[in-house]
Regions:
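ATP-dependent helicase/translocase motor core
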Residues: 1-173
Length: 173
């Protein structure tokens, strides 16, 4: 739905017609509304939950971000937070394209349904040719900043969603 849109059928008198409603305007990024929400309360199956950060495009939660202190391993964000959110508030992942887990020193991204082994670091901001300085990233706690600047800029995020997210429909490749 995010890439191709939704077909809406209308019937006027005896004539049936349809239109495609685009949920995201990939051709004109400025036509979309981007909203970042910090610690929004969401009613879950058993109680209220509060993800650290959600990024919405046109009201759809497309990016989930779980943040930890630098002393907490990123893997804990996956096992203690993301897995429980998936069970208790699964609706926030209906349109999710990216899950980010970070402690400032290490930042990983993956699909909401992926195992932790499929969450990977995002280290570059502008170019694949950039040299990675892991020491500087660790000293300045910039791994999450690199991801924000490198992936979550409006134009880049839309490009990533439109062109680099694989939608598994259960068919073999």
């Amino acid at each position: 739905y995010l890439r191709e849109g939704i077909q809406i059928t209308t019937r006027i008198k005896d004539k049936e017609d349809f239109d495609i409603v685009r949920l995201i305007d990939f051709d004109h990024p400025e036509q979309n509304t981007f909203t970042v929400v910090n610690q929004m309360w969401i009613k879950g199956h058993y109680n209220y939950r509060r993800p650290d950060v959600l990024l919405f495009i046109n009201g759809l939660p497309v990016v989930f971000i779980e943040l930890k202190k630098a002393t907490v391993k990123v893997e804990e964000a996956y096992h203690k937070n993301l897995l429980s959110y998936r069970k208790d508030i699964p609706n926030i992942f209906a349109f999710n394209q990216i899950c980010v887990l970070s402690n400032g020193l290490e930042t990983r991204l993956g699909a909401w349904s992926a195992s932790y082994d499929y969450f990977f670091e995002w280290l570059k901001v502008d170019s694949e040719k950039e040299k990675i300085n892991r020491k500087a990233i660790a000293e300045h706690d910039t791994s999450v900043i690199n991801l924000i600047d490198g992936l979550l800029r409006k134009d880049r995020l839309l490009d990533y969603i439109e062109n680099f997210v694989f939608f598994d429909r259960g068919n073999k490749i």
